[in-house]
Amino acid sequence: DGGAESEIEYENFNAVRADVDFKGFNIHPGSAKNTMINAALVAMEFDRMLPAGETPRDTEGYEGFYHLNHMSGNVEKANLNYILRDHDADNIAKRQEIMKEITAKLNEKYGADTVSLTLKEEYRNMAEKIKPNFHLIENAKKAVQKSGVEPQVIPVRGGTDGARLSFMGLPCPNLGTGSYACHGPYEHTTAEGMDIVVDTLTELVRLYGEMK
């Protein structure tokens, strides 16, 4: 599900979607003193209250983040859509708690139901399903080496199709496909890279065919 032909990945993000809705109160701005609640401004305040320096631009490796994916709004109503990501299960839980605390503080400041937060789990870190079946990683490393490149076992800063499959009973680490710059306008692969991937897969089949 993406990645350089040398990559082997069995750790992915725990993923949560957060939808934050803001309800404002509109009135003529000339007589708005202590009365108007601008939903768009409350939304901006919510975002400022999140921990600084924890966005995709600021993080790498095992560092998690809050990613503001979409925003819309006016005085009367606004919406912020975030994705929350973290490899560590405790940390993803803490990120959700922080959002709940911010919601409570803003509702205390502006009135009940000004801010409503909806959290939804999207997928989990497949490491807990792969580690008991670590032969998958050891054989993948052998197969990549046999294809002529040095294997790189790295954490996925995202999710993979294999993450869902792993929790459905089919432990499924991610193997690189020889693709680069994924999800952008310059996403590409090479014929040479695809040849290496085919060699890797062929070797994997051979290795498992010899297992008894």
Locations of regions flagged by a protein language model:
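Midchain, well-structured core segments that form catalytic/ion-binding scaffolds
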Residues: 1-97, 122
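Conserved active-site and cofactor/substrate-binding residues in soluble primary-metabolism enzymes
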Residues: 34-45, 63, 87-90, 94-101, ...
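Active-site-adjacent substrate-binding region
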Residues: 41-58, 65-67, 114, 124-172
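A common structural junction motif
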Residues: 54, 100-110
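Zn-dependent metallopeptidase/amidohydrolase metal-coordination segment
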Residues: 76, 150-200
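Conserved short beta-strand edge segments in small beta-sheet-based binding/regulatory domains
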Residues: 106-120
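C-terminal alpha-helix
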Residues: 200-211
